[in-house]
């Protein structure tokens, strides 16, 4: 992996054997090895239900449905995380590009990337997140 060196210690320490048992092969590859699921194949790409999207590894709430939008990119897209504490950003120099990788700030799981082509009337950001890195918890609209 040609991501910048990660010396950060995350609060939630993952046991690899336990993760391999608990996660699907795709969830494991995405969250632990920064793989990317194929566009338009993820479980949450078109989900419009009200609720919270949580880290599949540690269950930290990451995004709310109100921040989700249809970007047409093939992955769930959000214009902001739940708050400024839940996301960790790292420079990613893979595939001949320089991008900003997005990780769960509690466990370090790879989630996806953030780009500056989101809705201009919101934050201008597009958090492009792999469905395999998320679990969805449905909630009524008024909660």
UniProtKB/Swiss-Prot annotation:
Cofactor comment: Binds 1 zinc ion per subunit. The zinc ion is important for the structural integrity of the protein.
GO MF annotation: an example: peptide-methionine (R)-S-oxide reductase activity
One GO process term, biological-process aspect: protein repair
Domain MsrB: 16-139
Reactions it catalyzes: L-methionyl-[protein] + [thioredoxin]-disulfide + H2O = L-methionyl-(R)-S-oxide-[protein] + [thioredoxin]-dithiol
Active site: 128 (nucleophile)
Name of the top EC class for this enzyme: oxidoreductase
Cofactor dependence: Zn(2+)
Matching SUPFAM superfamilies: Mss4-like (SSF51316)
Binding site for Zn(2+): 55, 58, 104, 107
EC number, UniProt record: 1.8.4.12
Pfam families to which the protein is assigned, alphabetical: SelR (PF01641)
Gene Ontology cellular component terms for the protein in this record: cytoplasm
Highest taxon in the source lineage: Bacteria
Gene3D superfamilies associated with the record: Peptide methionine sulfoxide reductase
Family indicated by similarity: Belongs to the MsrB Met sulfoxide reductase family.
Protein name: Peptide methionine sulfoxide reductase MsrB
Gene (UniProt): msrB
